[in-house]
Amino acid sequence: MFLLKIKKERMKRMDFSLTREQEMLKKLARQFAEIELEPVAEEIDREHVFPAENFKKMAEIGLTGIGIPKEFGGSGGGTLEKVIAVSEFGKKCMASASILSIHLIAPQAIYKYGTKEQKETYLPRLTKGGELGAFALTEPNAGSDAGAVKTTAILDSQTNEYVLNGTKCFISGGGRAGVLVIFALTEPKKGLKGMSAIIVEKGTPGFSIGKVESKMGIAGSETAELIFEDCRVPAANLLGKEGKGFKIAMEALDGARIGVGAQAIGIAEGAIDLSVKYVHERIQFGKPIANLQGIQWYIADMATKTAAARALVEFAAYLEDAGKPFTKESAMCKLNASENARFVTNLALQIHGGYGYMKDYPLERMYRDAKITEIYEGTSEIHKVVIAREVMKR
């Protein structure tokens, strides 16, 4: 009986099935992706158009408030719910998956570190209000090296305002966001220990949008340069405490990497779906190419690696939701899922042959879109450093 009890408890802990609410969310996100995103995905990519109307619709059905309690306009849930929604979007429109995933960073940071007043002011706007959120850390000389940030936010004690000066680059949604979490040096001489997080609203005097980038992929996810020239924001907009900005940024990035993992498994699963359909329809030498062993091996490799990637992403999500350390697992899941997305979209394009190379078919777009998952929220190389450090800790 003792052994049987242990076995039952272990089986209970190893239950990977979704709850009823999570299944409903998955169905909702899948239907939204099929009805609202898939029909416009090619246009979004071709015209480099930010899907503003679709983002408003995401807010209307509660997807922009995932991870935020209902009292602040959110939908509740946690990281696994984010993975469910983002991966469904990734199957049909990677740009939209990226927009949702990156948007969620700002409200979750404000919910975790914000004051009561900040939560009441900004969270309803970022959830049910339909305003886009942005997270601005990267600078021209501060990519993987966050310690090289030069943007300053000096407190003017007479007006009780922070005065921001500096430039941020490659900020996803930066040109469209209504509420942004900016990382700047409040005490420049202290370096990383002098970095703080500050909430800045669109339209604040001294804050302007610079270059909007033309990218290889995820064209609908607008990426912009942010310029701060004597931009004054109330001291009350400080998120958390002074000098804690680097900690806030790194913790936010741990969660964001799971979001990128979700994007990557979504696009991989979408590429597999297209490939399976194609190999049954494509006739060569008098029979479907699905009968060819080489094609079967491709499909087997794609499906196996993607299933493993999903398992690692969902495990990292479980750890974050459970309040357990997850830095190593978030880096692992992002590294693995992103490299798998490139692998799968490459094989899927190969399976489609000449058709896959043409812009009339979605595979060439998916192939381009997949690459960014190996770069943003930390490159694959940086993640290997993070993983090695975590594994070798004593």
UniProtKB/Swiss-Prot annotation:
One Pfam short name: Acyl-CoA_dh_1
The GO molecular function terms of this record are: acryloyl-CoA reductase (NADH) activity; acyl-CoA dehydrogenase activity; FAD binding; oxidoreductase activity, acting on the CH-CH group of donors, NAD or NADP as acceptor
Catalytic positions?
E377
Question: Which residues, if any, are the signal sequence?
Answer: none
Write down any Gene Ontology CC term. Answer: cytoplasm
As for subcellular location, the record says: Cytoplasm
EC no. given is 1.3.1.95
Positions that bind substrate: S144, D254, G255, A256, R257, G378
Q: Identify the InterPro entries for this entry.
A: AcrC, Acyl-CoA_DH_CS, Acyl-CoA_Oxase/DH_mid-dom, Acyl-CoA_Oxase/DH_mid-dom_sf, AcylCo_DH-like_C, AcylCo_DH/oxidase_C, AcylCoA_DH/ox_N, AcylCoA_DH/ox_N_sf
Q: How does activity depend on temperature?
A: In the range between 25 and 55 degrees Celsius, the activity increases with rising temperature. Above 55 degrees Celsius, it decreases and becomes almost zero at 65 degrees Celsius.
Describe the reaction catalysed, as an equation: propanoyl-CoA + NAD(+) = acryloyl-CoA + NADH + H(+)
Residues binding FAD are: 135-144, 170-172, 282, 293, 350-354, 379-381
Which cofactors, by name? Answer: FAD
Keyword Zinc: yes or no? no
Q: Which PANTHER family does this entry report, sorted A to Z?
A: ACYL-COA DEHYDROGENASE (PTHR43884), ISOVALERYL-COA DEHYDROGENASE, MITOCHONDRIAL-RELATED (PTHR43884:SF12)
- What is its biological role? Probable catalytic subunit of the acryloyl-CoA reductase complex involved in the pathway of L-alanine fermentation. Catalyzes the irreversible NADH-dependent formation of propionyl-CoA from acryloyl-CoA. It can also use 3-buten-2-one as substrate.
Subunit architecture: Heterohexadecamer; tetramer of tetramers. Each tetramer is composed of 2 alpha (AcrC), a beta (AcrA) and a gamma (AcrB) subunit.
* Name of the protein in question: Acryloyl-CoA reductase (NADH)
Q: Which organism is it from?
A: Anaerotignum propionicum
Its taxonomic path starts at: Bacteria, Bacillati, Bacillota, Clostridia, Lachnospirales
- Which gene holds the coding sequence for this protein? acrC
